[in-house]
A protein has these predicted regions:
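Cytosolic regulatory regions of ion transport systems
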Residues: 1-151
Length: 151
């Protein structure tokens, strides 16, 4: 799969490492000087320095031909705009990390009208996992199968 990752923080870096090891064609974008270039030297990925929400930067990363664009910067708005831009360029699927509770009620709109395939709030997902464990303590041990798609 052709995958573009916007934002090379902890999440973006971990995704790039994992996906490139699986043999995917990965491009990474980060606006901090040298970050994308260093990661490209470490991993088999294309590294691009720039604003991941910018049309021209996404064109460099070939986001329009991507099967998946993942926006995992620290900025919710940057992530949403990056995904909207990628979708307009032709990306098949987009995932945005959206942490602010302010956007909770707008997720359906963002998916239907703005082209987001999926939005993920890591804090909300963690809270749900903890609540599930508290309801069913015997389920505290979770095994993953099918490359993490089934728990």
């Amino acid at each position: 799969m052709k995958i573009v990752i916007v934002g090379i923080g902890k999440v973006g870096r971990a995704l790039a490492e994992h996906l490139s090891k699986e043999g995917h064609d990965v491009a990474v974008i980060d606006n901090r000087p040298g970050i994308a270039e260093r990661l490209a030297e470490e991993l088999d990925v294309l590294g691009i320095e720039g604003n991941g929400a910018a049309y021209t930067v996404q064109q460099q990363a070939r986001a329009g031909q991507a099967d998946l664009v993942i926006a995992a910067t620290d900025g919710d708005e940057v992530n949403m705009i990056a995904c909207m831009t990628a979708k307009k360029l032709g990306a098949k699927n987009t995932i945005a990390r959206v942490r602010s509770a302010e956007y909770e009620g707008q997720l359906r709109f963002m998916q239907q009208e703005m082209g987001l395939s999926l939005s993920i709030n890591p804090e909300r997902e963690t809270a749900r996992d903890i609540a599930r464990i508290l309801r069913f303590p015997a389920v505290a041990k979770v095994e993953t199968f099918a490359k993490g798609r089934v728990e």
